[in-house]
């Protein structure tokens, strides 16, 4: 799809808030409070099933959809979950472009900034939206497939913002009831995702009518996700758009899906966000209206614990934009005994268009589809950064946003354009770039933050575009992006960057494979022969099994070799086993290294996981030695063996490069003739 073999550079934009850190927007209010509910549902909810949490609200000032700060008035979520400390103050989305619909002005921008122009509800028909004040519209939905039986105590602690020890059974039941209400009211007819567990389309995402809450085979949300949140908003409230960005409506509907996995791999530190921008037009829009030079901005105001010592950066290979701590430790995290983390955003997917060419393919609605092509091969097309308290302050209107979207300074505003580089590199010989701070803070090479501007409060902006949206005989057009919000914690500020990049690689790999991670090769079918002080293992007798293993090819992984182990007991794991032999393909692959996080130190390490010698493939072995006890085999003694197959992925950017089959333990007792 993109970036394991494609160079992608990201850049951060860090805004200088005119409102300052003590702005009332940073104060938690009843307007944002999670407990504010309607007869139909709640107006704010939280994604909180893994190691990172995030609030979503449809009540913001003066419009609707937003990510309000609710944790200690400073963060919109926590990392690690339950710590009481977070990384993001606020995040949002902006859309801008040149609109040709018969109205004016041509340049318009709408979205969710510190103030939002998006109000609750979908657009029913061109120019007509749902009533934003209707309790059935002014709400968010949250579901999890296991809500009936799950232990919701930790979930309730996050939702009701109280210590785990103070959560009551009434809290858990109230939350369980809300899950049930959202399940029954799941707005599939508005575009919320759902799936079936049976039939030819089992576990494929569906968007649109057909969901039946009473059908046990129908499940709301993203397949496989532990939790899914959904909301919808639009920009048709002309009073709000003019007030916030000086821009009249465009006729955009924004559908937000957030989901997370509670798992024992790096996905446990990630929240996924799918944003669908549907151009439906205003009431006066022409049937052939279009928007050219469309850009989508995913921006964030990270407060990485203490906001005053943050820096921004990006990885030009991974396409990862992030914020990290300037100092080895962070005051807020140090106060709870934790090292300074890092947080990043990654566009996993940019908008695509229909070409009809069967050689083209793109992910649309979490499904690879032929005949579609991404507008931009690299989904992040601009990445610049701003710092609070510097000469570059927040954009205040559509022309300033449009300059940011194209990699320029917000002022002088469009149609004037000053490249972002000129304000920071101070080198007229440097070719203007849309990608800033793409150096490496760990090795201190390249352009890194903190040299021109001291550490402080940072705002980051990720941009994808340009692309086009158009009405066809009045029919809507859709752009879809998917973003990963990633939290990572190493042993200090710099090792957290390394862990963050590892998690990002894992996220992209999982997404490109639609979260169906490759299974290991099949386990060899082994026959054993118990002889006089000898054991013979033969895994070549079943040719069908051999063919299935040695022709294995899954998601870039190909067969590489066999391992033979002796285990101390029938219940021992491979980590306790003695590797007796490896028979591998004769090629350039010998030692295979994988990245792993040391559970004791949090450091990201490269460790050997498979060790071959180009011995060539064999399908049998004769054993005369007890490798566990380091002595000859003894008749009458039972020994335990396993033969596994392993595969290798040659892609250096794959999150893991070796897969080994599940060991099948064989008990063998040598006997006298």
Indicate where each model-derived feature is located:
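Bacterial N-terminal signal peptides
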Residues: 7-16
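Extracellular/surface-associated beta-sandwich interaction domains
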Residues: 19-673
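Positively charged n-region of N-terminal signal peptides that target proteins for export
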Residues: 1-5
């Amino acid at each position: 799809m993109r970036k394991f073999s494609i160079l992608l550079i990201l850049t951060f934009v860090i805004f200088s808030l005119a409102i300052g850190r003590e702005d009332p927007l940073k104060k938690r209010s009843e307007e944002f409070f999670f407990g504010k509910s309607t007869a139909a549902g709640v107006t704010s909810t939280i994604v909180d099933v893994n190691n990172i949490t995030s609030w979503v609200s449809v009540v913001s000032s003066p419009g609707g959809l937003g990510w309000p700060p609710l944790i200690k008035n400073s963060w919109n979520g926590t990392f690690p979950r339950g710590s009481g400390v977070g990384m993001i103050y606020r995040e949002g989305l902006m859309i801008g472009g040149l609109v040709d619909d018969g109205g004016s002005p041509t340049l318009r921008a709408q979205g969710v900034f510190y103030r939002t122009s998006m109000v609750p509800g979908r657009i029913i028909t061109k120019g007509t939206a749902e009533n934003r004040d209707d309790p059935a519209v002014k709400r968010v939905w949250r579901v999890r497939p296991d809500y009936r039986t799950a232990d919701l105590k930790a979930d309730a602690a996050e939702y009701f913002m109280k210590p785990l020890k103070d959560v009551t059974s009434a809290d858990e039941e109230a939350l369980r009831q809300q899950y049930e209400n959202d399940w029954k009211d799941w707005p599939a007819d508005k575009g919320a995702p759902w799936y079936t567990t049976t039939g030819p389309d089992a576990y494929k995402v569906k968007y649109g009518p057909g969901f039946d809450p009473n059908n046990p085979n129908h499940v709301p949300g993203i397949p496989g996700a532990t939790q899914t949140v959904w909301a919808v908003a639009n920009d048709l409230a002309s009073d709000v758009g003019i007030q916030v960005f000086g821009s009249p409506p465009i006729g955009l509907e924004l559908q937000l899906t957030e989901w997370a996995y509670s798992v024992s791999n790096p996905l446990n530190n990630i929240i996924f966000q799918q944003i669908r921008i549907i151009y439906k037009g205003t009431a006066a829009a022409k049937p052939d209206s279009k928007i050219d030079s469309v850009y989508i901005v995913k921006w964030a105001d990270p407060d990485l614990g203490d906001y005053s010592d943050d820096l921004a950066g990006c990885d030009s290979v991974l396409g990862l934009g992030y914020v990290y701590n300037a100092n080895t430790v962070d005051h807020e995290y140090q106060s709870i005994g934790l090292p300074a983390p890092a947080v990043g955003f990654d566009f996993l997917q940019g908008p695509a268009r229909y070409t009809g060419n069967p050689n083209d393919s793109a992910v649309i609605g979490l499904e690879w589809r032929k005949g579609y092509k991404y507008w931009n091969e690299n989904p992040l097309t601009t990445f610049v950064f701003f710092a609070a308290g510097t000469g570059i302050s927040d954009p205040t209107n559509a022309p300033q946003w449009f300059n940011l979207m194209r990699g320029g300074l917000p002022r002088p505003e469009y149609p004037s354009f000053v490249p972002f580089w000129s304000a920071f590199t101070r080198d007229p010989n440097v070719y203007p770039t849309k990608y800033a701070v793409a150096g490496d803070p760990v090795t201190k090479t390249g352009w890194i933050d903190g040299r021109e501007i001291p550490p402080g409060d940072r705002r980051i902006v990720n941009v994808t575009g340009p692309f086009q949206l158009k009405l066809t005989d009045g029919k809507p057009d859709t752009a879809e992006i998917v973003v990963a919000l990633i939290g990572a914690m190493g042993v200090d500020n710099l090792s957290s960057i390394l862990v963050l990049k590892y998690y990002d690689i894992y996220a992209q790999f999982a997404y490109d494979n639609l979260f169906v991670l490759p299974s290991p090769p099949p386990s060899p079918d082994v026959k054993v022969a118990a002889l006089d002080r000898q054991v013979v293992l033969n895994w070549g007798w079943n040719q069908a099994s051999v063919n299935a293993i040695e022709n294995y090819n899954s998601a870039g992984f190909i067969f590489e070799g066999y391992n033979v182990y002796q285990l101390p007991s029938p219940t021992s794991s491979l980590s306790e086993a003695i590797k007796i032999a490896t028979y591998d393909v004769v090629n350039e692959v010998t030692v295979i290294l994988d990245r792993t996080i040391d559970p004791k130190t949090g450091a990201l390490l490269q460790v050997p996981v498979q060790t071959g010698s180009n011995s060539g493939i064999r399908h049998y072995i004769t054993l005369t030695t007890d490798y566990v006890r380091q002595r000859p085999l003894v008749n009458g003694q039972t020994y335990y063996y396993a033969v596994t197959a392993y595969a290798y992925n040659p892609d250096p950017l794959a999150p893991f490069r070796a897969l080994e089959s599940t060991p099948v333990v064989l008990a063998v007792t040598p006997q006298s003739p």
